[in-house]
Amino acid sequence: MSNAIESLGSLWGPLLVLGQIGLFTLVLLLSIAFLLLLDRKVWAGVMMRKGPNVVGPFGLLQSFADFGKFLLKEIVIPAGANKAVFILAPILTCTLAFVTWAAIPVAPGTATGTSWVIANLNVGVLYLFAISSLGVYGIIMGGWASNSKYPFLGALRSAAQMVSYEVSIGFVIVTVILLVGSMNLTTIVNNQDGGIQNWHVFSFQYFPLIVVMVPMFVIFFISALAETNRPPFDLPEAESELVAGYQVEYGSTPYLLFMLGEYLNIVLMCAMMTILFLGGWHGPISLGPELTANLPPLLLSLSGLAWFMGKVLFCFFLFALVKAIVPRYRYDQLMRLGWKIFLPTSLAAVIIVAGYVTFVGGLS
């Protein structure tokens, strides 16, 4: 009997992790379905159209109808394509997009200093860098395996674009790491407790670094648009030039996986903006330790989750708005912006923040 109890106890940990992964995946998929609808509604609203409004009340079930349509379509593989790589590319892209979310904390835990996260890594930022940098391989594989010039050109554009703007994003994140002194994402969020004035985008607790951190937030937002191939930086899948870029030959479920991976990365960037700059799950007004000590921990966790989701939704709305109102950049303008403006600016910010931490932060 004791052996059976011990074996059940040893299985409880892995089962709990699997349950967390399953719940997280389900919530992500449902979130993507409705965020995709929001994206289309914003685009339609700017053009003074109604957008999807037929399937379900207010068009809420449109994404699920599209999902069913993709699943029922036949998978067509071009005659000259490398079949194995052609199928593997969207699977790799979607899998990497899901795996990255394992280190994202979404709400405070019931115990002090903990959070709702699958893997609370001390090197969470490094983990995100490592996984997200692999995403370009799925796009290159898909473009090359299609055996067509338009997908291949789109894949090459994507590789150059993602590498260019990953450098700027990296330097921006380094400024936050220098301020906090940790690469743990939960620690980064907890460092912004105390109200909106302590959010890193304003950094009043590190005055006068507001003149540095506000531009860093703007650079991160614009670089995130380029990193996720969103307009006005959708050069890899430019419809007017490359038909649909690396996705030209894809349809049915493989195309659905590419699109799912793209939107997962977009929401990931929104979550990163929330964690690094917008206070994570902390509200704009601090309740104070006296009041929070008397509130149920679960209520604090749920309110933190609501704040986190609201901020992510706001960031996604900005992504959708930019898509609807900003025209596409030329490729040379895209490269010039990344290498000649964002890179030196973010590098200068790293030097300024490092100097502040060394000479001011160290003395306080």
Swiss-Prot record:
Molecular function terms from GO: NADH dehydrogenase activity; oxidoreductase activity, acting on NAD(P)H, quinone or similar compound as acceptor; quinone binding
Enzyme class, broadest EC rank: translocase
Keyword Lyase applies: no
One GO cellular component term noted in the UniProt record for this chain: plasma membrane
GO biological process, one term: aerobic respiration
Its membrane topology: Multi-pass membrane protein
Keyword Ribosomal protein on entry: no
Catalytic reaction list: a quinone + NADH + 5 H(+)(in) = a quinol + NAD(+) + 4 H(+)(out)
UniProt-listed Enzyme Commission number(s): 7.1.1.-
Membrane spanning residue stretches: 15-35, 84-104, 123-143, 169-189, 206-226, 257-277, 302-322, 341-361
Domain of life: Bacteria
Subcellular localization: Cell inner membrane
Keywords: Cell inner membrane, Cell membrane, Membrane, NAD, Quinone, Translocase, Transmembrane, Transmembrane helix, Ubiquinone
NCBIfam families documented for this protein: PRK06076.1-6 (NF004745)
Subunit structure: NDH-1 is composed of 14 different subunits. Subunits NuoA, H, J, K, L, M, N constitute the membrane sector of the complex.
Biological role: NDH-1 shuttles electrons from NADH, via FMN and iron-sulfur (Fe-S) centers, to quinones in the respiratory chain. The immediate electron acceptor for the enzyme in this species is believed to be ubiquinone. Couples the redox reaction to proton translocation (for every two electrons transferred, four hydrogen ions are translocated across the cytoplasmic membrane), and thus conserves the redox energy in a proton gradient. This subunit may bind ubiquinone.
Family, similarity comment: Belongs to the complex I subunit 1 family.
The protein's name: NADH-quinone oxidoreductase subunit H
